[in-house]
């Protein structure tokens, strides 16, 4: 079934539209951008079961990080939703095809944390080669290192970087940034990316290989920088690990599902992979006490934080809010800057031809209560509240708001839709 949803009504004659931050509670960055066109709610939820009914019924826009997942079943709970903006680049936690079917645009912020993710990737690579983490840990544990023999023992496995071959899987924004940094350290850099047109390897001075097998066979260190989809889940598995060079390193700052952690743990224990560094994991939040990696040696793990800096966080939140603003003040999807399901949305929906009064009877004389301007708290443990600005405590709204009627979804027009691309080069990490 295709969803038929109208444009977002905005202006003095219409109710102030509701926008919700689904899995967070800090709206201080978003408010200056949205306060004159929307009421901003924060839900602080980890699933749609924790999202207040008012948001499910009335929110036209949603902001979200990577800590909540929206399946088709989840998306169908939102009765008025027109746009979701992922505060970050990756959107594998959203069913974008189902969103398109339901008339919901999905956008991301692909560029804000490119530098941070690339820097973190190089940090992991350098850590594996120079064993900084393990040397620090040895001193913390009281190991006394004085003689040359003791240094050799505690630093065993440290290697020279110059002349080593770094293999990059996925040469999107982050992949390119990693390549440029790696060359400065003396790496020979090759990459595998079947979606890029010819010529970029010449522009960047890189070596391109035509198959994943070639990259794995020729790389001393493999680093992942591609989005996650149904085609590349467990791209690194027991079979592909065996195609890697004996004693190679593995780094993943992209998506946890790209690596089969059971296969990786076994390869680390057997020494087929000399060391690995992961910022993303199959199950998050990650814990060393659970899962197949708990006993794996020569492993560095960080908590999906490679993307973060204060500057990057502010930039991506500002851009996400601006995308929501474009949706409210403009036309979906034409006014959007980073809509990742635009083709599917355009083919599957015909909201532009609908009379808004038909789809939203409250705009045609039905009773409707307007939110006061500011931030609305609809956190799981709280009641709806609104304030003029942002303060720790919120003033309660009445629970007696009249219900808003929403029609059933219109039947599918039966058009042939263009399939989504298997991969978007803007989805490198976050």
Swiss-Prot record:
Site-annotated residues for Cleavage: 364-365, 377-378, 399-400
Pfam family, one: 2-Hacid_dh
Phosphoserine sites (modified residues): 289, 412
Bound cofactor: record note: Cofactor binding induces a conformational change.
Needed co-factor(s): NAD(+)
Annotated region described as Interaction with GLIS2 1, given as residue ranges: 1-59
Keyword Ribonucleoprotein: no
Region feature Interaction with GLIS2 2, mapped onto this chain: 277-349
Keyword Nucleus recorded: yes
Region (Disordered): 398-430
Residues that coordinate or bind NAD(+): 89, 169-174, 193, 226-232, 253-255, 279
GO biological process: membrane fusion; negative regulation of DNA-templated transcription; negative regulation of transcription by RNA polymerase II; Notch signaling pathway; presynapse to nucleus signaling pathway; regulation of cell cycle; regulation of transcription by RNA polymerase II; synaptic vesicle clustering
Record-level Gene Ontology MF annotations: acyltransferase activity; chromatin binding; DNA-binding transcription factor binding; identical protein binding; lncRNA binding; NAD binding; oxidoreductase activity, acting on the CH-OH group of donors, NAD or NADP as acceptor; PDZ domain binding
Sequence ranges of Basic and acidic residues compositional bias: 419-430
Positions of the catalytic residues: 255, 284, 304 (proton donor)
GO terms for cellular component: cytoplasm; extrinsic component of presynaptic endocytic zone membrane; GABA-ergic synapse; glutamatergic synapse; neuron projection; nucleus; presynaptic active zone cytoplasmic component; transcription repressor complex
Entry keywords, A to Z: ADP-ribosylation, Cytoplasm, Differentiation, Isopeptide bond, NAD, Nucleus, Oxidoreductase, Phosphoprotein, Repressor, Synapse, Synaptosome, Transcription, Transcription regulation, Ubl conjugation
EC number: 1.1.1.-
CDD domains named among the record's database cross-references: CtBP_dh (cd05299)
Subcellular compartments: Cytoplasm; Nucleus; Synapse, Synaptosome
Post-translational modification: The level of phosphorylation appears to be regulated during the cell cycle. Phosphorylation by HIPK2 on Ser-412 induces proteasomal degradation. ADP-ribosylated; when cells are exposed to brefeldin A.
Assembly description: Homo- or heterodimer. Heterodimer with CTBP2. Interacts with ELK3 (via its PXDLS motif). Interacts with RBBP8 (via its PXDLS motif); the interaction is disrupted by binding to adenovirus E1A. Interacts with PNN, MECOM and ZFHX1B. Interacts with ZNF366 (via PXDLS motif). Interaction with SATB1 (non-acetylated form); the interaction stabilizes its attachment to DNA and promotes transcription repression. Interacts with PRDM16; the interaction represses white adipose tissue (WAT)-specific genes expression. Interacts with GLIS2, HIPK2, FOXP1, FOXP2, HDAC4, HDAC5, HDAC9, NRIP1 and WIZ.
Function: Corepressor targeting diverse transcription regulators such as GLIS2 or BCL6. Has dehydrogenase activity. Involved in controlling the equilibrium between tubular and stacked structures in the Golgi complex. Functions in brown adipose tissue (BAT) differentiation.
Similarity remark: Belongs to the D-isomer specific 2-hydroxyacid dehydrogenase family.
Protein's UniProt name: C-terminal-binding protein 1
